């Protein structure tokens, strides 16, 4: 029995996957913000970040973006090899 999805079902699934992907991206962004804030921001007496805090936040975000990119590349490689 050939059970293919109709065009409408396919569109619905793609839309749901896109929504889930957006939610995941927002969650990742919020988690990264919280992680870097907790790791880097130490002085709450002044409104602006000092130079040390700014550098820490920059390095924290850069490190996490590099890791995420490397992880995505690895998953793409596995997917292209048919392993994922």
UniProtKB/Swiss-Prot annotation:
Origin species, per record, is Dictyostelium discoideum (Social amoeba)
Q: What is its main location?
A: mitochondrion
Q: Which GO terms describe its biological process?
A: protein insertion into mitochondrial inner membrane
Q: Which UniProt keywords apply?
A: Disulfide bond, Membrane, Metal-binding, Mitochondrion, Mitochondrion inner membrane, Protein transport, Translocation, Transport, Zinc
Q: Which Pfam families match?
A: zf-Tim10_DDP (PF02953)
InterPro entries associated with the record? Mito_inner_translocase_sub, Tim10-like, Tim10-like_dom_sf
The superkingdom of the source organism is Eukaryota
* Assembly and binders: Heterohexamer; composed of 3 copies of timm9 and 3 copies of timm10, named soluble 70 kDa complex. Associates directly with the TIM22 complex, whose core is composed of timm22. Interacts with the transmembrane regions of multi-pass transmembrane proteins in transit.
Q: What is known of its domains?
A: The twin CX3C motif contains 4 conserved Cys residues that form 2 disulfide bonds in the mitochondrial intermembrane space. However, during the transit of timm9/timm10 from cytoplasm into mitochondrion, the Cys residues probably coordinate zinc, thereby preventing folding and allowing its transfer across mitochondrial outer membrane.
Q: Tell me the membrane topology, using the record's own terms.
A: Peripheral membrane protein
**What does the UniProt entry say about where the protein is found?**
Mitochondrion inner membrane
Q: Does the keyword Nucleotide-binding apply?
A: no
Protein family: Belongs to the small Tim family.
S-S pairs: 36-60, 40-56
Name the record gives this protein: Mitochondrial import inner membrane translocase subunit Tim9
| One annotated GO molecular function | metal ion binding
Q: Where is this motif: Twin CX3C motif?
A: 36-60
- What role does it play? Component of the TIM22 complex, a complex that mediates the import and insertion of multi-pass transmembrane proteins into the mitochondrial inner membrane. The TIM22 complex forms a twin-pore translocase that uses the membrane potential as external driving force.
